[in-house]
Each structure stands twice: as structure tokens, then as C-alpha cells.
Swiss-Prot record:
Classification of source organism: Bacteria, Pseudomonadati, Pseudomonadota, Betaproteobacteria, Nitrosomonadales
Protein name as annotated: GTPase Der
One Gene Ontology biological process: ribosome biogenesis
InterPro entries listed in its UniProt record: AAA+_ATPase, G_ENGA, GTP-bd, GTPase_Der, KH_dom-like, KH_dom-like_a/b, P-loop_NTPase, Small_GTP-bd
Compositional bias annotation for Basic residues: 453-466
Molecular-function GO terms, alphabetical: ATP hydrolysis activity; GTP binding; ribosome binding
Family designation: Belongs to the TRAFAC class TrmE-Era-EngA-EngB-Septin-like GTPase superfamily. EngA (Der) GTPase family.
Organism annotation: Nitrosospira multiformis (strain ATCC 25196 / NCIMB 11849 / C 71)
Binding-site list for GTP 1: 9-16, 56-60, 119-122
Domain KH-like: 351-435
Pfam families, sorted: KH_dom-like, MMR_HSR1
Function: GTPase that plays an essential role in the late steps of ribosome biogenesis.
Residue ranges constituting the EngA-type G domain according to the UniProt record: 3-167, 176-350
NCBIfam families, per the entry: GTPase_EngA (TIGR03594), small_GTP (TIGR00231)
Length: 466
């Protein structure tokens, strides 16, 4: 599991800005609006090859006893309990406040490892701006600027120092782990029970029935699988209960832990933006994907056509590699094809791609459609090899590769996917430009003979060309 970093502090100290910096997103803009900070913002980032989860929280008011502030305080305390490391954010420009002291006392009582980050210190003397914060008794303050990125990597390095210094490892299991994810009440637990052939988990017609990720091992046709039933991922504004908010973390961790994800869509309602957000997170995590459109038996032909059009419009980024199944989890209709699709997606995600064949495929693709020119030069793609699996990573070597456009990258991705049959898994392509051995070097001075020859060539050129 990834280590979880929780951002805590009073309002307007820059927690959401730091969250966006760590996750390289803008997902936490809503956290700046009063009354909306009850909703957690979850994301994942990387420091080099070291992944981590980040939880953004609302402004912390530990002394609040009623209303929204009280609810926010309870949820922040729950977040602290879930944290591996708490990043306590304070404002270096406004200085130490009484509320900062109250929050610091609450964090000391929690027993969680806490790092103190003094934000908004750009252009200020570090020793001066951090001096008064030693009073909080939380160790040496780290001066950062979330807006400009100053010392943010140093802060994360300090937070992760007690965790194994290892990149994300390829799966060592010899059988697929399958996470069942989707919005609440789309039939995830019903589908789990149908695949297992028994009432293994509670399936109830009420959103939020599943609170935690449940791992279930089973065998089918002589092969072992692990199913992961997860809590529903609702749109931020509709999440009310604290326990449900933190079940989101478990669901995101289940996606990271899985080899293949089955995304369950509800055909009885329109495909929502939240379905697209979940699909985007799965794609970003690099997990193989199978889509199950549930409750298909409840629709007539016109409604089925409308749902298919809705899928084409809202989920186009998943259609080039993921298989779609139209099922009824309750009656079992269409579910027999799910596990074969899972096997195919798992095989594609873990596939070994030979270097000679990759290079031949690359050169054939370039010969058929060369990359477009960038100025006076054209990118040169020389050879390719595999750099990892789950998802497959293809590394292409050459020169001037920074000029390869996204459209040509998609062309190469589709070519590799068709050649190797990589259906059901995302495919990553990384370009690496060879090192110039003469970079940073100046030419040696000419000898007397070389200088005379150069002079004769210049004279000849002037006489001939004027």
C-alpha cells in the first residue's frame, strides 16, 4: 500500500495549493470555498519512483461544537487517524496564531508523526519566518512555497523517509486481483455474489452499503482469482457521512492493489461525469480495465441505443482498449464473459514484449507514416524495448524526440496495441533521447596546417560564389 499523507491546518494556509502541487492537478480548487471543504479530495503523486496518496482536508477548527465547523473538525480527526504522516500547514506571512497552537496540541495528542510546513515563504528569510513556529513543539519547521514549489520535494522526502525506498513493484502474484468499482448502488456487490455463486457480501438496494474493501479468493475453471468488493465512489458534493469519505481511500488503494479493474456502470441511469472521473483515475493508475454495463435487462431497445450513445460521448478515452459487457448482475445475464475478458486484460498487462519485434514494429510504423517535422529537423526513432509491465511500458530511443506530437504518439500506441494484441490494458510510451557526446565541449584549437587549409577553402568559396 502507498503511504498516506494528510494535509491539516486552518483555513487559507495553502493546503489545497499544496495538494494540487503534489498531485499535479487542480482538483482541490473547491476547497477554497467556505462550506464545501467538508468533502475530501483524494489524489496520488510520485516523488521520483516513490508513489504516495494525498488527502486534502478542510480548515481545522478543533474547538467547534456544532454546525459545519464541528462536522469538518470530526472529519479531519478521522483523516488524522487514517494518516501515515500528517503535514501540518501554517501561514508564514500571517505568522503564528492561537488557532495554530490549538491545532498543534490536537496533533500531539493524536500520536501521529507530524511534520510542520511553513507555507508562503517565497522571498522571505527562512530563519526569520520560521523562528516563532518552534513554539509549537513539532520539530524543525520546513519553509515551503506551495504556489512556487520551493522545498516541496524536500518536505515529501522527509515525510517518506521511514517508508521503504523502493519504486512501485510489478505484481508477484500468479493470479489476477480484480477490483469491482463504480458509483454507489450500481450493483457491485450483486455482481461479486453472482461471480462467486453465493451471497458472500451484503447486497442491498441502498447507496453506501459497502463501507470497506473486501478481498475474496475463489477458483473458476482451475484458476485462482481474488475479487475486491469496494465502496461506491460518489460525487464529492453528495458525500455526507465521515465513514463514507474515508472509504474512498480504501477504494483508491484497492485500485492500486488490483491487476484488473471492473468498472460497473448503471444502465438504468445516464452515464455520469463521475463515471468518467472513476475511469480516468483507473487509466491514470495504469490498471487493466473491463467495463460492465449493469441492469441491461431493464431497458428497451430505444433506451439501450441511448445508453450506448451516452457511453460513446462520455467515455471515448476508454473505448480504444477496454472491453464492454452488457449484463444483469442480479440475473446473471451476460456475466459469463467477464472472467475471460479479465484473463485477456491480465495477460496483456503482464505481457512480455520482445525487443527485436518491438523495434521491427516501430521501424515499420515509421516507414509507413514518418513523424512530422519540427522546424528544420524530423524526429528520428531508432529502436524500442520494454521498460515494465502492468501497464506495459515501451521505451523508444532516438533523437529530437521532444518534438514528437501527441497525435503521433497515439498512432504508435495503436500500432503496438494491434501488433501485440494488447486489449484491455493501458499502454505507456516513453521517449528517450540519446546523450550527445560532444555536449558542453568546445573544439580543440586548429593547428597551423589546419588553419591554412581553412583559409584556402574560404578564399576558394569567395572566388566561386562571390
Amino acid at each position: 500500500m502507498k503511504p498516506t499523507l494528510v494535509l491539516v491546518g486552518r483555513s487559507n494556509v495553502g493546503k489545497s495549493t499544496l495538494f494540487n502541487r503534489l498531485t499535479r492537478s487542480r482538483d482541490a480548487l473547491v476547497a477554497d470555498l467556505p462550506g464545501l471543504t467538508r468533502d475530501r479530495h483524494y489524489g496520488h503523486g510520485k516523488l521520483g519512483d516513490r508513489p504516495y496518496l494525498v488527502v486534502d482536508t478542510g480548515g481545522f477548527e478543533p474547538m467547534a461544537t456544532e454546525g459545519i465547523l464541528h462536522e469538518m473538525a470530526k472529519q479531519t480527526l478521522q483523516a488524522i487517524d487514517e494518516a501515515d504522516v500528517v503535514l501540518f500547514i501554517v501561514d508564514g506571512r500571517s505568522g503564528l496564531t492561537a488557532q495554530d497552537k490549538i491545532v498543534a496540541e490536537q496533533l500531539r495528542r493524536s500520536g501521529r508523526r507530524t511534520l510542520l510546513a511553513v507555507n508562503k515563504t517565497e522571498g522571505m528569510a527562512v530563519s526569520v519566518v520560521t523562528a516563532e513556529f518552534h513554539e509549537l513543539g513539532l520539530g524543525e519547521p520546513c519553509a515551503i512555497s506551495a504556489a512556487h514549489g520551493d522545498n516541496v520535494n524536500e518536505l515529501v522526502t522527509l515525510a517518506l523517509q521511514d517508508f521503504p525506498d523502493e519504486p512501485e513493484q510489478e505484481r508477484k502474484d500468479d493470479h489476477p486481483k480484480i477490483a469491482i468499482v463504480g458509483r454507489p448502488n450500481v450493483g457491485k456487490s450483486t455482481l461479486v455474489n453472482t461471480l462467486l455463486g453465493e451471497e458472500r457480501v451484503i447486497a442491498f438496494d441502498q447507496p453506501g452499503t459497502t463501507r470497506d474493501s473486501i478481498y475474496i479468493d475463489f477458483e473458476r475453471n482451475g484458476r485462482t482469482y481474488t475479487l475486491i468488493d469496494t465502496a461506491g465512489l460518489r460525487r464529492r458534493g453528495k458525500v455526507q457521512e465521515t465513514v463514507e469519505k474515508f472509504s474512498v481511500v480504501k477504494t483508491l488503494q484497492a485500485i492500486e492493489d488490483a491487476n484488473v479493474v471492473i468498472l460497473v456502470l448503471d444502465a438504468a441511469s445516464e452515464i455520469s461525469d463521475q463515471d468518467a472521473h472513476i475511469g480516468g483515475f483507473i487509466l491514470e493508475a495504469g490498471r487493466a480495465l473491463v467495463l460492465a454495463v449493469n441492469k441491461w435487462d431493464s431497458l428497451d431497445e430505444y433506451q439501450r441505443d441511448m445508453i450506448k450513445r451516452d457511453i460513446n460521448r462520455k467515455l471515448p478515452f476508454l473505448q480504444n482498449f477496454a472491453r464492454f459487457h452488457y449484463i444483469s448482475a442480479l440475473h446473471g445475464t451476460g456475466t459469463k464473459g467477464l472472467l475471460p475478458s479479465v484473463d485477456a486484460a491480465y495477460g496483456a498487462a503482464m505481457a512480455h514484449l520482445p525487443t527485436p519485434r518491438l523495434t521491427r514494429t516501430l521501424l515499420a510504423a515509421v516507414e509507413k507514416q514518418p513523424p512530422p517535422r519540427a522546424g528544420m529537423s524530423r524526429p528520428k526513432l531508432r529502436y524500442a524495448h520494454q521498460g515494465g509491465s502492468n501497464p506495459p511500458l515501451i521505451i523508444i530511443h532516438g533523437s529530437a524526440l521532444n518534438a514528437v506530437p501527441q497525435t503521433y504518439q497515439r498512432y504508435l500506441e495503436n500500432t503496438f496495441r494491434d501488433t501485440f494484441g494488447l486489449e484491455g490494458t493501458p499502454l505507456r510510451i516513453e521517449f528517450r533521447t540519446g546523450r550527445n557526446p560532444y555536449a558542453g565541449k568546445s573544439p580543440a584549437p586548429l593547428t597551423e596546417a589546419e588553419a591554412k587549409r581553412a583559409h584556402r577553402r574560404r578564399r576558394y568559396g569567395r572566388k566561386k560564389y562571390g
